A protein has these predicted regions:
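Glycine-rich, Arg-bearing micro-motifs that act as flexible, cationic patches
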Residues: 137-155, 177, 288-313, 328-329
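A cross-kingdom feature marking solvent-exposed beta-strand/loop segments within repeated
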Residues: 74-83, 120, 143-144, 148, ...
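A short acidic, glycine-rich active-site loop
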Residues: 82-93, 232-245
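General small-molecule cofactor/ligand-binding pocket signal
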Residues: 64-66, 110-114, 165, 211-213, ...
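Short, structured interface segments
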Residues: 153-172
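Short beta-strand elements of ligand-binding domains
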Residues: 137-138, 164-169, 292, 319-323
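Small/aliphatic-rich secondary-structure junction motif
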Residues: 3-5, 23-79, 180-232, 254-264, ...
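Structural beta-alpha unit
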Residues: 1-30, 100-134, 255-289, 326-337, ...
């Protein structure tokens, strides 16, 4: 997401309509064909599973319960092979039990236990198996830190090949997730609007209210000393013009959404889109925020735009961040993803 207002071309409606109004969007449109739920041994796994299953049920996508078994940090030597095999079998049994308990809700669940460094293995496994949505918690086995994300979550998000559903560790734990309000930030760009078919499909599946939000920035004027009266008037005229255009834009988006959905629009005046959206999330208390990884700027050298990155590091509600494969990592990961993974010895050395 970027913090700019709609372009003149968008004022006139001269761009492709991204919204499918039938409410029966296919996975070809939503682009989430396979889901992986990252499940560690912490209690936060109880937060990940319901959200992964809610997505799988709404999208008709298979879901994999994925666990990575890591050697304990700081050992300085390889663990005993027998002890390691026991850990692997225990992990397989635990994940299989979790899947068995939830197959009545979503039948198409499989499980996978892999070995190695968590973030690296999750990224490579997702790439090799065509995962397009990775569901994970902001923190995991290492516990809650003073930072917005745990180290593993940060690495997985930065290296992910597809979209991310990030669950804050402080969010409520529930056996079944119901999204009553879905907030969608829009900056007027086609990139931001590309999430609309998915948001609409989720709203239909969950009978949720959609809240479309646009932040109107305060235009910057070059200042050398106090602003003259003409400059103050000019800035106010620009703000009023931008608010008018944004109102018309949100009204057009709302009018094209399928009948049968509850839709609200929210227009905020603020100097910064990041803090404006943060305030909207705090006040509206949505159950889910759906946004594009990039908005108008769509810089290819970073995995997320400034707004998405800010919301990730200040997540207080679940964030569904829709993104394509990060091009700045493509060559490196394609070269390393299929290397033979290191294995523990089968006998003492």
């Amino acid at each position: 997401m970027s913090d700019t207002h709609p372009t003149p071309q968008q004022e006139k409606g001269n761009y492709a309509d991204p919204i499918e109004t039938t409410g029966k969007e296919s996975n070809e449109q939503t682009g989430l064909h396979r889901i992986a739920a990252c499940i560690d041994t912490s209690g936060f796994a109880e937060k990940v599973i319901p959200h992964a299953l809610a997505m799988a049920a709404a999208l008709g996508s298979p879901v994999t319960f994925l666990r990575v078994v890591e050697a304990k940090p700081g050992l300085g030597f390889l663990p005993d092979p027998v002890e390691w095999d026991i850990r692997i079998r225990e992990a397989q049994d635990e994940v299989a039990k979790l899947a068995d308990e939830r197959r009545q809700e979503v039948p198409n669940i499989d499980t996978q236990v892999i070995e190695g460094e968590a973030a690296e293995k999750i990224s490579h496994w997702a790439h090799d198996h065509g995962v397009e949505l990775t569901v994970l918690c902001t923190h995991g086995d290492s516990g809650v830190t003073e930072w917005g994300l745990g180290s593993t979550a940060q690495k997985v998000i930065d290296r992910a090949y597809g979209s991310i559903l990030l669950i804050p560790c402080g969010s409520a734990t529930s056996h079944v997730v119901h999204y009553r309000r879905i907030l969608v930030p829009l900056d007027g760009s086609p990139h931001a609007e590309s999430v609309l078919p998915l948001a609409i499909r989720l709203a239909h599946a969950q009978s949720a209210e959609l809240i479309f939000v646009h932040v109107v920035p305060i235009p910057e004027l070059t200042e050398v000393g106090p602003l003259e009266n003409e400059a103050v008037e000019l800035r106010e005229q620009l703000i009023q013009r931008n608010e008018r255009v944004a109102h018309e834009y949100l009204d057009r988006i709302r009018a094209r959404v399928a009948a049968g959905l509850s839709v609200r629009t929210l227009l905020l005046r603020g100097a910064d889109a990041r803090t404006g959206l943060g305030r909207a999330i705090a006040e509206e208390a949505p159950d889910l925020v759906v946004l594009a990884a990039h908005g108008r700027t769509r810089r290819s050298d970073v995995p997320f735009g400034s707004v998405a990155a800010y919301l990730i590091n200040h997540a207080v509600v679940p964030l569904l961040i829709i993104r394509r494969r990060p091009t700045h990592l493509a060559r490196h990961d394609e070269a390393t993803a299929h290397q033979t993974p290191l294995r523990l010895p089968t006998h003492a050395q």
